[in-house]
């Protein structure tokens, strides 16, 4: 509230209007570029014409400007151009000259700085000149070195070319000296004459070469070694142990293949043919040759099969025994001459055995290998002498009479 409103006065004063000021950017005095602040001028207040009233006018008061804190400030002075005359605001609002700050620009400091800079400039100039001289010398030396290398390479190439030409000349002369002129082709008539007058010694020397060539052709074509090649191979066997060992290896491989083929086990027999599932060798049954079993790809009886199995069983544990191939099993079956018999093992007699004829025989002598057949000794591995029908019938009757 304005205090002027309450005063009793015959002069009317207009209430002051508040002027709004636009915020201006703050200008620092230490900046290089001078900043000028626009000062807003307040318009002059005009005196309001007096209102006619009945009150008497006591006095005339001249309208004057009212000073207020909101009035525009005085225009700032332009900062001096000389840096020494400028002012700088330091901490706590204290304003001092630039010469009094740490960045001082006094004459002494300027002189010291100028002398130091001159000395540094002089030293830098000398070092730069020395560096430039060294660079120039290095460049010059590098150029000279490159020229020398190019000259040396060119001279070496010329020398190599000269040496190559000389070597070619020497080689051509050498080949001309050692070259033998080609002989003319001999006509067939003259060749026959030369062969006619050839000495027998030369002919003997040429014949073995032709025989060897023919032997080689025979070996390549037919795979047969001719007698001429056998003689040479025998001589090589006696003189060359490596060749002898190679031949021995070939023969050993062949022997191993033969033994493996002979010792190969027979195919397993099928048990399907036995309906009852019982081993036929243990059955008490009268068999005939017509009902015998095929064994080892041949017709054989049960006794023959059992005898062969026993021999194989006895040989199995003897691993150090040399290989002895089994004798082939031959059947003595003749059509229309079948005879019934009992197997000896099935009968339970260990002292009796069957001979190779397939008949039951009892050993009556001490000699195990001889069997009395037809009143004469005969090895039991040999084939039996054919009997007459009468002798066979009589022998069968005697056999069954003894068994009863």
UniProtKB/Swiss-Prot annotation:
Disordered: annotated segments: 192-214, 306-325, 376-404
Pfam family name, one: Sas-5-like_implico
Subcellular location as annotated: Cytoplasm; Cytoplasm, Cytoskeleton, Microtubule organizing center, Centrosome, Centriole
Coiled coil: 134-170
Compositionally biased residues, Basic and acidic residues: 192-201, 308-324, 389-404
GO cellular component: centriole; cytoplasm
Domain of life of the source: Eukaryota
Keywords: Cell cycle, Coiled coil, Cytoplasm, Cytoskeleton, Developmental protein
One of the GO BP terms on file: centrosome duplication
InterPro entries registered for this protein in UniProt: Sas-5-like_implico
Subunit-level organization: Interacts with sas-6 via its coiled coil domain. Interacts (via C terminus) with let-92 (part of the PP2A complex).
Function summary: Required for centrosome duplication. Essential for daughter-centriole formation. Requires both maternal and partenal expression, suggesting that it regulates centriole duplication during both spermatogenesis and early embryogenesis.
Name by which UniProt lists this protein: Spindle assembly abnormal protein 5
Protein's organism: Caenorhabditis elegans
């Amino acid at each position: 509230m304005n205090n002027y409103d309450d005063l009793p006065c015959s002069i009317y004063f207009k209430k002051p209007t508040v002027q709004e000021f636009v915020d201006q950017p703050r200008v620092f005095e230490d900046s290089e570029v001078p900043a000028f602040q626009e000062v807003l001028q307040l318009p002059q207040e005009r005196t309001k014409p007096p209102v006619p009233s009945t009150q008497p006018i006591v006095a005339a008061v001249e309208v004057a400007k009212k000073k207020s804190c909101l009035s525009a400030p005085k225009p700032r002075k332009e900062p001096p151009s000389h840096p020494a005359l400028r002012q700088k605001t330091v901490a706590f609002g204290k304003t001092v000259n630039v010469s009094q700050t740490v960045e001082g620009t006094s004459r002494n400091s300027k002189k010291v700085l100028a002398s130091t800079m001159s000395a540094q400039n002089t030293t830098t100039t000398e070092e730069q000149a020395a560096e430039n001289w060294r660079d120039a010398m290095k460049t010059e030396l590098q150029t000279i070195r490159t020229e020398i290398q190019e000259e040396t390479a060119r001279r070496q190439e010329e020398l190599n070319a000269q040496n190559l030409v000389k070597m070619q000349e020497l080689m051509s002369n050498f080949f001309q000296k050692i070259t033998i002129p080609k002989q003319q082709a001999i006509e067939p008539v003259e060749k026959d004459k030369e062969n006619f007058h050839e000495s027998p010694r030369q002919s003997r020397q040429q014949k073995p070469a032709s025989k060897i060539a023919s032997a080689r052709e025979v070996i390549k074509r037919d795979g047969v070694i001719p007698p001429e090649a056998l003689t040479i191979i025998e001589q090589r066997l006696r003189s060359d142990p490596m060749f002898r060992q190679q031949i021995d290896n070939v023969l050993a491989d062949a022997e191993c293949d033969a033994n493996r083929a002979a010792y190969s086990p027979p195919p397993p027999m099928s048990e399907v043919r036995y309906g009852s599932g019982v081993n036929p060798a243990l059955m008490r049954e009268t068999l005939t040759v017509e009902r015998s079993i095929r064994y080892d790809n041949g017709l054989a009886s049960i006794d023959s099969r059992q005898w062969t199995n026993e021999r194989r069983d006895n040989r199995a544990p003897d691993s150090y025994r040399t290989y002895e191939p089994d004798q082939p099993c031959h059947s003595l079956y003749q059509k229309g001459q079948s005879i019934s018999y009992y197997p000896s093992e099935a009968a339970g007699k260990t002292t009796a055995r069957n001979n190779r004829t397939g008949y039951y025989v009892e050993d009556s002598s001490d000699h195990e290998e001889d069997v009395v057949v037809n009143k004469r000794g005969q090895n039991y591995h040999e084939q039996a002498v054919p009997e007459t029908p009468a002798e066979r019938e009589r022998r069968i009757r005697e056999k069954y009479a003894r068994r009863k």
